[in-house]
Amino acid sequence: MAAPAGAGALIASPDRRRCLWSVLAAALGLLTYGVSALEVYTPKEIFVANGTQGKLTCKFKSTNTTGTLTSVSWSFQPEGTDTTVSFFHYSQGQVYAGNYPPFKDRVSWAGDLDKKDASINIENMQFIHNGTYICDVKNPPDIVVQPGHIRLYVVEKEILPAFPVWVVVGIVTAVVLGLTLLITMILAVIYRRRNSKRDYAGCNTSENVSPVKQVSRKSPSDTEGLVKSLPSGSHQGPVIYAQLDHSGGHHSDRINKSESVVYADIRKN
């Protein structure tokens, strides 16, 4: 007996579902494959004088070029609270300011997405603006991002630091590293000089070299007389008389032979 046509469709439906889920999983994997991390850079803290404009600098780095999908959001966490309020959004060249009273009509766009800049300006900053500011950037497919945090302090003009804290820290660090390098180089030079003095085994000519008394040059007749004056009873092998050059010139290694050499046989009695 043949099975109804509808039964075959019901039997095949689980296989079709498994196939559909496999296709969806593969598509999701392709979509998430191109997702990469986006890096945001902000100063850790800044000081702004009361009643003046403050610039919140935010830079980012992305492997993809910016476009219409790139967006920037700024949030604020008031000092002493855990509540975060979004007060500014920028996308497709448009500014979307929130209705949060402390920032109403105060915030303006100061960045350039083509230059990876997401900075903003806040006019007439007051003490109520003390807190932490959060910069969040999305640049699909770079959507995995660690937002940047800025700790902002509004202070009186009289106590405003001459330089930002991060600048002072950088200068101090550079000075310390420079001094350390200089001291290390000086110590290395001193150490090498001391070792070279210890390894040197030379002597002072004026102190350790005693003068050598040169022997007067003998004439041939004097040499013959010396031979004749020896006792006649002894026996000795050939005797060679030579004269050395003690002049100390450039060619001191050359041996200068005497003008005459006398051989004598002396026999013992």
UniProtKB/Swiss-Prot annotation:
Gene label: MPZL1
Spans within the Extracellular topological domain: 36-162
Location within or outside the cell: Membrane
Keyword Repressor: no
Stored SMART domains: IG, IGv
Residues bearing glycans: N50, N64, N130
Family to which the UniProt record says this protein belongs: Belongs to the myelin P0 protein family.
Superkingdom of the organism of origin: Eukaryota
Residues where Phosphoserine is found: S206, S210, S219, S221, S260
Motif (ITIM motif 1): 239-244
Primary location: membrane
Protein name (record): Myelin protein zero-like protein 1
Organism: Bos taurus (Bovine)
